[in-house]
Amino acid sequence: SPEVALKTVRQGSFLEIDRALELEARAFAAIAISPGAKDMIRTFWYHRTAAERCDGLPKTEAMNINKIGILGAGMMGAGLAFVSAAKGLEVVVKDIAQEALDGGLAHCQAEAAKRRHLSQDERDELLARITWTLELAPLEGCDLVIEAVVEDDKVKALVTQEVEPLLAEEGIFASNTSAIPITHLAKAAEVKERFIGLHFFSPVEKMPLLEIIMGEETNDETLARCLAFGRLIGKTPIVVN
């Protein structure tokens, strides 16, 4: 733990090197065999295995997801846009306020600047894959749309009804809600079989977990495609219901 590390460093600073190293080794050994450490190691391997094998999940062949739409350009929406564009996807971010779009763009520019391993041309190409818009039309043909608007079921129903007709033929509509039941939100959808919950954690660029929530009518193909999408953007997808 951080407390033990600090204590060990402080105590070791007053000792000769051999005794300080012995003190450090004893402290490390005590932490390494503690119940907390064992639980963290077990959880790490569980998540890694789940991400690689997806045991128990449907084997339906997932159709490609190449173009995604994101509704809402806040921190969540901008984060989703960046991680998706970083994996080569075409992204459209739609918001009702230009100020929000400008903030989302600035967020992605700042994230791109942190990628020191990328050349300037590669950063420019990444950012160019993201379209920022006040209009609905650029969302046409999206294979997946994720709404990240306010936690209000009426607002979510409205954007579902506005955007669903623009989806690709087999397009999926997903909600990033953290509180509203997916089956309830799916009532606003025309095709409930392709309505699903994709709950990301903020900041999206750093948090690895992706919770997938199925509605009562969500089909296996939709689930399989969303699992594939989650793995593509580097997340650990877990079906929570």
At which residue positions do the language-model features occur?
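Internal alpha-helical scaffold of NAD(P)-dependent oxidoreductase catalytic cores
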Residues: 212-241
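Short beta-alpha connecting loops at secondary-structure transitions
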Residues: 91-96, 147, 207-215, 239-241
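Generic, well-ordered alpha-helical scaffold segments in large soluble proteins
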Residues: 8, 31, 79, 83, ...
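Rossmann-like NAD(P)-binding element
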Residues: 96-100, 113-184, 188
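NAD(P)+-binding Rossmann beta1-loop-alpha1 motif at the extreme N-terminus of oxidoreductases
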Residues: 52-111, 131, 215, 219
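Intrinsically disordered, low-complexity segments enriched in small/flexible residues
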Residues: 1-64
